[in-house]
C-alpha cells in the first residue's frame, strides 16, 4: 500500500545521507592530512 512506498523512500533517503556523511568524513580526514604535511 501507500505506507510501504513511503518507508521505501525513507529508507533510500537514509541510505543516501549515510553515504554523504561517510564521504564528508573521508574528505575531512583527507584535508586534515593535507594540512599536517
UniProtKB/Swiss-Prot annotation:
The keyword Repressor does not apply. Keywords: Antibiotic, Antimicrobial, Cytolysis, Hemolysis, Secreted, Toxin. InterPro entries: Antimicrobial_3. The keyword Ligase does not apply. One of its GO terms (cellular component) is extracellular region. It is found in: Secreted. Expressed by the venom gland. Its main location: secreted. Disrupts biological membranes, particularly those rich in phosphocholine. Has antimicrobial activity against Gram-negative bacterium E.coli, Gram-positive bacteria B.subtilis and S.aureus, and hemolytic activity against sheep, pig and guinea pig red blood cells. Has insecticidal activity against S.frugiperda ovarian cells by opening non-selective ion channels. Enhances the insecticidal activity of spider venom neurotoxic peptides. Belongs to the cationic peptide 02 (oxyopinin-2) family. This is M-oxotoxin-Ot2c. It comes from Oxyopes takobius (Lynx spider).
